[in-house]
Amino acid sequence: MGLSVLAVGILLSGTLYIMSVDNSLMGQVIRKQIDNGTDMGRFVPIDAPNTPMGVARGIHPGRVAWAHDPKAAVWDGKRGLYSDPDNNSQTRVDDMMEGVIIALTRQNTIDKAWDELFRTFNYKKGKGAVKYKKGEKIVVKINLNDNGGTNIIDATPQSVYSLLHQLVDIMKVPQNCITVYDAQRRGISAVYDYVHPVYPNVNYQNWGGFVPDVIRYSSEITDAGARSLARAAYEADYMINMALMKRHSEPTDKWRDSAGQTAITATGKNQFGSIGNVPPLHLSIRDWSSFRGMGTYNSIVDLMAHERIGGNTLVYLVDAMYVNPKHNGKAVRFQLPPFNNGWTSSFLASNDQVAIESVVLDFIYSELPLCANADNFLHEAANIGNPPSGIAYIGKEQGSLGVHEHWNNPTHRMYSRNLGTGKGIELYRVPLNEKRPAIEYFYADENALHYKTSHAEEVRLNGKRLEDAEGIIPLSISKTTAFNLEVLVNKKVTSSQRVVVRRLEDIGICQAKDMERQGSAFLNEDGSVEFKGEKGSSEGSVSWKVNIPHKGEYYLVVSYTGGNPVPSYLYINGEKISENIGYLATLGEKRGEGKGGKKWIGKQCIS
């Protein structure tokens, strides 16, 4: 059998951005926007409750579906990670995801609901009311702002799993036609570790791979990197925007860049992870700035209107399992009913981006203060054809990107369509039964399967009945094996979950001492390789080579410890075959920390 030479390279570099620049508004140069040390103010809506603006979108116009199950997110806030499988019920996440998708349509089953979403989307795109066709590409933009693998809130792995389950297992979308990505961030570890064993052929991407000169901005922004779009998004037939419920900035009267740029991060700012250079957009989204305010340009509106971003979005989802109080914050509990000092443990979905952003803003504002002018971008988007700013947005011919309004109060959460007083938003609560049969958790470690079920008459593992509702089953397998756990009522399966335990053969180990080192990479006495130099200034790389078969499948397991994750690339016979196979990161910040922490595992098929 012939051999190829595989090379893996790791690169470390730093970049400094200067944030105070002259910017142009409506074709005129305005004074330099310098926000350091200034007051972000506090948000007070200028529009009264239940006074909708814009034109509602969706099969049910203006509908935002909301599902809440307090037993879905059960992390105690202290032990382990919020993303751990025993802290989130896959069954309950599946039910919430299914509930909000069905609620957006006129259907009563999840397969028919997705089919209607695809057909409606294609009809509006001028393709006719056709269903999904095998081979069409779907991208899922998730939020990995903090690189995954810590208790700073990112996309919940169980949420990504649930979406892939619906697309792959129910709608029969080929795994290799799906890409899950955040092109602006350095890690996908927690999501990848949980999801990849079951869906190994899905494309999991983070940093890299941009198509130049795709995005044009209506004002201010001319940077070439900001005009580039992630290749995955550019080539997709369908975009699924899977955001978080996140307050981006904690208001302060002495702003610094670390405080954050804008009020909230939901489906709008989530797309900053799709563009090649983000800092040039920051000035334009500081609606709280004394240089801006209500009725001013906001670049998020351009992304919402863009044909390859907002215009290519099949559905908007908000993973609200845990609310992040700041762009790099840890989960915060909500006090008001139905949360009752608990996690939000929710999902939202809509076909109207302005509406779902408005609802996310209202939820956050009901519990946390926001910086001034938090909904300026929604006023602009709802009225893009004739916005308060007077900006001639590139997407102005759309007239409106959706409907915006504020609910009547944080207790009743009623919008104009709920009240029957207008054609604004409808917040639809998906009915759920907390006492339904469920798999509360099911996962594997190196030695055993761990499971817990509730309200089941019978529990089966790979078709064999288990005597206990919860337990630990020792593992003794010599090859990769799939395990399927089922809960039954009246002999009928009501919930199931699959776990795949991988066993690798022909394992080869590449020692750090065998690496080729360049620049700031040094070999330590203990045999590890370290990048030395001041933070943000050291530049270097390490690489190693291994012979592999011309065809087949292989996995790479790379252990790396450091506070600054670094990118890595694959080369075969000298040719780079990946934009970036992933940033490597662990929980430790110093050499020797992070034992047993996160490892990067990548798979590459050679043909």
Question: Where are the predicted features?
Answer:
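Extracytoplasmic
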Residues: 504-607
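Short beta-strand segments within Ig-like beta-sandwich modules, predominantly Fibronectin type-III
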Residues: 463-469
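Solvent-exposed segments in extracellular or luminal domains encompassing
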Residues: 471-483
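Extended, low-polarity segments enriched in aliphatic/aromatic residues
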Residues: 29-134, 145-434
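Edge beta-strands of extracellular beta-sandwich domains
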Residues: 492-503
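Proline-enriched interdomain boundary motifs that mark the N-terminal boundary
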Residues: 434-442
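Short coil/turn motif common to extracellular beta-sandwich-like domains
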Residues: 441-450, 551-553
